[in-house]
Amino acid sequence: MSRQEQTPLFSGVVAHAKHNPVQFHIPGHKKGAGMDPAFRSFIGDNALSIDLINIGPLDDLHHPHGIIKEAQELAAEAFGADHTFFSVQGTSGAIMTMIMSVVGPGEKIIVPRNVHKSIMSAIVFSGATPVFIHPEIDPLLGISHGITIEAVEKALDAHPDAKGLLVINPTYFGIAANLKKIVELCHSRDVPVLVDEAHGVHIHFHEALPLSAMQAGADMAATSVHKLGGSLTQSSILNVREGLVSAKRVQTIISMLTTTSTSYLLLASLDAARKHLATNGRDLIGYTIQLADQARDQINAIDGLYCVGKEILGTIATYDYDPTKLIISVKNLGITGYDAEVWLREHYQIEVELSDLYNILCIVSFGDTEREMDLLVKALSELADLHKHGICERSPVSVYVPNIPTLAMSPRDAFYAETEVVPFEDSVGRTIAEFIMVYPPGIPILIPGEIITESNLAYIRENNRAGLPVQGPEDDTFRTLRVIKEHEAIR
């Protein structure tokens, strides 16, 4: 048996459960016996028997030296990392760890503006100053792509004291930059590269997919095993390459951000998922790519719909892409992505990953079969047929994405500053003190410290009218916004 077929953590907790020890420790449900019967019946006794805590035989995520240490070492081997840290705080916890491991108060980190809210949270917690790079905007789809080598070089030239660069690779929509070149550029200046790889756990295991962060030589990568790798929701990993980053510092930070009640269900699922990817991943992902490509061709044969393919490549921001992500533009049907999402839910019980003003995103994984793909194509064909009248007569739909606002003060200073509430319509020109984002994908429209513009307000109104999930402000009716208080001179 090869090393990658071993599951020391999963096998260890199962063996412990089979011994059926008498538990005088938490959790108090005691293998389900003290739990609501309906919930226990639904979850099952196997799962409840390994809902355990860090007792002696089971190691401790905060100080791994036994089965958790072995499982993390196997994961590092599988992903080509020097060290791998398991996260039960999701990829958000891993992302925060990355950032707080390399920057402190007042230090600079270069980040694209289309970052997940966890990145901005880490910047607030650390007190770092973000240097924003404008991501390339796709004018046809209305989505953000990655950052370019040219933009990274300009940022490094302007801010040679930056302590790190964060890259989203691949993006939520599966678009990848030339990560290897970006890493080489940063390393030539001794700047570590941190990768938000939340949507790319699978790319390491198939040559037809973009290079993974570790393959490209990045220093750290927060990788969501639960998203596309087969582990339970909220389980993730942080891969680390030593050199510009200290693994001991990373262990300290991730421990600070991690609950002491670590879920062994989540940890065991990471161990099992790693084995599955390392031993069967290439075949499973190859089949997934085949399913997605077939569906893409069928969707593109439907009048009024467009599913993105290889033709998107070739620009400075679209170096490679993940074909298992189906970006489906519905704008030529005269409806929003949210309209399509709701219709698919109500008529076919199909749930998509996300929708925006112009698109829906469907994620294909090795948990899918031809049955699910055929149902999706059938549903989309019916949806298009409902809106076929007038497709040809419609003029091309232009997409609208507002410019990135000016940052007036650091997000941390804004977050902790004295604030006041003003009417939404009167907030133009004021400095925002709260996050506003559409979630999913969790990319901020405004972050604390930015100056509010009319185009930002118009974009918020448009998303709200479309029914999209705009989140963040204290006032979820959007009648008011919290801004930095302005002090007038005493007369």
UniProtKB/Swiss-Prot annotation:
Give GO terms: molecular function aspect only: arginine decarboxylase activity
Coiled coil, from the record: none
GO biological process entries: putrescine biosynthetic process; spermidine biosynthetic process
Residue list for modification N6-(pyridoxal phosphate)lysine: K227
Pfam families documented for this protein: OKR_DC_1, OKR_DC_1_C
**Pathway the protein contributes to:** Amine and polyamine biosynthesis; agmatine biosynthesis; agmatine from L-arginine: step 1/1
A Gene Ontology cellular component where this protein is annotated is: cytoplasm
Cofactor entry: pyridoxal 5'-phosphate
Sorted alphabetically, which Gene3D superfamilies does this protein's record hold? Orn/Lys/Arg decarboxylase, C-terminal domain (3.90.100.10), Type I PLP-dependent aspartate aminotransferase-like (Major domain) (3.40.640.10)
Where is the protein situated, by its record's location annotation? Answer: Cytoplasm
Q: Which reaction does it catalyse?
A: L-arginine + H(+) = agmatine + CO2
Q: What's the EC number here?
A: 4.1.1.19
Keywords noted in UniProt: Cytoplasm, Decarboxylase, Lyase, Polyamine biosynthesis, Putrescine biosynthesis, Pyridoxal phosphate, Spermidine biosynthesis
Signal peptide positions on this chain: none
Family designation: Belongs to the Orn/Lys/Arg decarboxylase class-I family.
Q: Which PANTHER family match?
A: ARGININE DECARBOXYLASE
- What does it do? Catalyzes the formation of agmatine from arginine.
Q: What is this protein called?
A: Arginine decarboxylase
